[in-house]
Structure formats: C-alpha cells, structure tokens
C-alpha cells in the first residue's frame, strides 16, 4: 500500500536555530526532515512526496491504464509524471503511451515523458501542448498551486484560479470519457467551479489522500468520464 509508513515514523529530527534562518524556514525544514513521506519518497526514488497523493488517487478511482495519453500541468519536480509513467507503462519508444508535462521549471527526464518548459499561462503554451499530444488526452492532471502567503482565503482563491484554468484547458483536449484531476484548497469559493465541472463530467468527487498533510486545506477534485 502507498501509505505503509512502517519504519519511516518515530525518527524525530531537531533543527538547530540559526541567525540566518527565519522562523518560517526553520519550521518548514523541521517539517520536511520529520515527514515520513519525504523519507519514503527518497527511498522509493520519487522526486516528491506528492507522488503518493497521485498513487492514492489512482488506488481509489482506478484512473490509469496502459496506452494512455496524459497531460501533467505544473509538473516540477516530476513526481506525478513519474507515477503516471509507471502506471501507463510509458517508454520513450511507444508513442501510444505518452505524457506531456509542462512547467516553467525544468525537470529531469522521465521515461515516456515529453517535457515542455513553459509558463502554462503564456499565450502559445496550450497550442504547444496540443501539438505535442497529437490527438486527444485520456487524463489531464494538475497539482498546480500558487505560492502560499499564509492567508487562507487568498491562498484558496489563487489556487482555485489555477484549477479553473486547468479545467478550461482540459475541456479542450480531453477525449470523451477522459478524466480530470486537480488540486484545490477548501474555502467556500470553489462551489461555482464544481457546478461547472459537474455539467461536463459524469462523476465528480472530492478526495483527500492520507499522504496530504492533515493541517493542509488541500483536497483533490477528481472528475471522471467527460461527457
């Protein structure tokens, strides 16, 4: 199971204070050093703890199968692309199994992944992804989130706007019965978006993976079977 953390817990690491380190950065470092999913990701070869979130989403909803075309929005550092590559059995030689990953930050190569280093919001980015797909996508997934500022309402709205943009793009490229996955932060303003998504997909669910930090308001919107 992806959430089997036996051997990764109960190894608390203290972080020494430093004049050069702010309180918030010290707290972040302490959380990273003591996060069992961070340790597990390092051992399992995943580039981020977020990989386990997608694995849990797949275990719950059975989204990925071989011979799929997948778009990964906001892919860096590549954890979700790694998971998708394994689940669809992607390779650099099989064009039927293809992942198009987009991020403004560079990511190291993943088997079966075509990486587009662009800002998703630039005018020509959508067309570049569509050309790279060479057809319709089976899954569009987005783990994009704005840089948080610690103000929950603002963080909620900013990430919701990213989700809305990803949703509008998904409608353009998904084939019928395709799936859409995206991160949102709970905060109340997401209801209008949910109504839009429900009009376009047969099944829409909310899911919070156990690998998502308990204090985080993030949840994942899982929209199944585009109409």
UniProtKB/Swiss-Prot annotation:
Its main location: cytoplasm. InterPro entries: RNA_methyltr_RlmE, RNA_MeTrfase_FtsJ_dom, rRNA-MeTfrase_E, SAM-dependent_MTases_sf. One of its GO terms (molecular function) is rRNA (uridine-2'-O-)-methyltransferase activity. It catalyses: uridine(2552) in 23S rRNA + S-adenosyl-L-methionine = 2'-O-methyluridine(2552) in 23S rRNA + S-adenosyl-L-homocysteine + H(+). Keywords: Cytoplasm, Methyltransferase, rRNA processing, S-adenosyl-L-methionine, Transferase. It is an enzyme of class 2 (transferase). Pfam families: FtsJ. It comes from the Bacteria. SUPFAM superfamilies: S-adenosyl-L-methionine-dependent methyltransferases. Specifically methylates the uridine in position 2552 of 23S rRNA at the 2'-O position of the ribose in the fully assembled 50S ribosomal subunit. Belongs to the class I-like SAM-binding methyltransferase superfamily. RNA methyltransferase RlmE family. This is Ribosomal RNA large subunit methyltransferase E. It comes from Rickettsia rickettsii (strain Sheila Smith). The gene is rlmE.
